[in-house]
Amino acid sequence: MSLEVFHKSAALSLGVELELQLVNTHDYDLAPYAEDMLRLMHKIPLPGSVVPEMTSSMIEISTGVCSSSSEVLGQLSQIRDALVKSADKLNIAVVGGGTHPFQQWHERRIYDKPRFRELSELYGYLSKQFTIFGQHVHVGCPNADSALLTLHRMSRYIPHFIALSASSPYVQGQDTAFDSARLNSVFAFPLSGRAPFALTWDDFKVYFDKMTRTGVVKSMKDFYWDIRPKPEFGTIEIRVFDTPLTVERATALAGFVQSLASWFMNEQPFMPTEDDYLVYTYNRFQACRFGLDAVYVDPATGGHMPLREHILMTMERIARHAGAVGAGASLHLLQTSVERSDNDARWLREKQGEERLLAEVIRQAAQRFRGGVTHTQLP
């Protein structure tokens, strides 16, 4: 299959996808209710879409094309409200977070869809272990070459995205010591990691054609890169975020991406180089392991500094662009959390420290996700 034409999209437009957990309200373990949820949700007129994911205890929601983070919040809130009301009817709950803290991967069921069955046959147990939950942010690019430039500029900020969204400290009932353990599961797949260093669509097409000739890939969907071009949408898709515990934080992360993209497209602040990737995996590991306490190695200078400081410095640098795209509130929310050394991984650990019961932590996380939606479950 040849590479798709890169479609036009409005520069800096946004789209957000969230993979969410479905849990029972007895012991708050994952529950295979995706099909029932989809049946209920498809009766409700909503923006965006609600679709199944790899295993039947997951569901993915997505916005339509949005021009601002406030529009993202409006759409996510509307879908969230419908989700939790549908879940109430089934006596289950919907939860954010990058991993379920104590689910056992071997108990998962692959959702009955041809692509998921094909992936399960190819990847074996990895498919069930892929019951992890991420946020993807699409940002519109005016043309294909701009998309690749933006992708490689954005790669310097992968640690920032990981630390700000980290919400997966627990796996199989254990504290992993990672703020984002979810991304360790992604690395197991052979076509994960980072995109090849190509700054023009012609060069990228050469790479893609070579890969398809090997028979290893058939389409862009086969690449699990941290950031990948999405030619059919005219976007790049950033895929390293853990799903946050609230739609408000998910929106703030999208606003941060949009502000960075505005800075890149309007000021061309630096030219990415292949050498940017010398420290890429190290920076990525630091952010996964230590979150906001990570060390950041500047790809341009080789200098070391606390990631927290680099995040705050970046936010100050892009504040004007955030204001211009209407993402000032998003930046403020994230800035405040960084100053308090506060991310969702910390919240989960603090709750577990108080409760000493991961099921209760999930119950509280479910309450947090639903926001102000009144509970409609029957007694």
From Swiss-Prot:
Enzyme Commission numbers on file: 6.3.2.2
Gene Ontology BP annotations: modified amino acid biosynthetic process
Presence of the UniProt keyword Nucleotide-binding in the record: yes
GO MF term list: ATP binding; glutamate-cysteine ligase activity
Pfam family, one: GCS2
Domain of life: Bacteria
InterPro entries attached to this UniProt entry: GCL_type2/YbdK_subfam (IPR050141), GCS2 (IPR006336), Gln_synth/guanido_kin_cat_dom (IPR014746), YbdK (IPR011793)
Reactions it catalyzes: L-cysteine + L-glutamate + ATP = gamma-L-glutamyl-L-cysteine + ADP + phosphate + H(+)
SUPFAM superfamilies with a match to the protein in the record: Glutamine synthetase/guanido kinase (SSF55931)
Keyword Ligase part of the UniProt annotation: yes
Keywords: ATP-binding, Ligase, Nucleotide-binding
HAMAP family attached to this UniProt entry: Glu_cys_ligase_2
Family, similarity comment: Belongs to the glutamate--cysteine ligase type 2 family. YbdK subfamily.
Function: ATP-dependent carboxylate-amine ligase which exhibits weak glutamate--cysteine ligase activity.
Name of the molecule in the record: Putative glutamate--cysteine ligase 2
Lineage of origin: Bacteria, Pseudomonadati, Pseudomonadota, Betaproteobacteria, Burkholderiales
